[in-house]
Amino acid sequence: MRILLCVIVLVVVAGCGRTADVPDRRLAPADLLLAPSDLPPGFVVTPLSVADLAASNRVAFDDAKTARFAPDFCRPTADATLNDQLRADNSAVLAARRLNTGLVELVTTQRRDLGADLFATSGRCARTETTITKGNLAGTRIVTEYTALPVPPIDGGLRSGERAVLVRSTVTTTLPDRGVRTQIGFAGYALLNRASSGEVTVQLTVAGEASRATNPPTPGLAPLSDAGFVDLFGKALQKVTNSDR
């Protein structure tokens, strides 16, 4: 939950001692986003600017600073680090909704730390627990369980230095009154480097609707199947990889 800086190349014009600017042919992040027609049935594009996305993320990160996180070494860091670098001149965002399901894609020339993503969603960090300590929801307990998903097939495969991380998350929230909500979401992150794009980060998140607070809990509904999300993220990656053709 995001225009490419141009590199000016000077070429000496033979015989006249002058230089001419050769335009950078790299595509801008906005050119590498999914098209509305690529989205799953029922999703409708909604307005969202890079500035609005970054501001919304910043509020969530500030709130998270006062929460207890266990294991503490699993506290996510990649989102906050990248968020501080997002600007309208280096990023583009696509947002869409289907009823209460939200989808956000970000393409940016800024580098995301995928190693931190992998660490925070696997191994001993595949299950984490967050406890809210301040405000009206103090005492709320949030358990997040991550499941790794396969990297979608790409023509020619990922090149040296490129990588991708995909996860499915199941979030179980126990409120102070003991009511329990569940929510299923997906996230995909990739670093790609192609001649037509330069190095870019592609990230796609889909958040399903949270269930009503009940006890015993009501299972959350997945916004997409695992295979459906992998396929959609594959389309997002192909927007970059196919641009070289």
Give the positions of each predicted feature.
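Extracellularly exposed regions in secreted/surface proteins, prominently low-complexity, repeat-rich
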Residues: 135-245
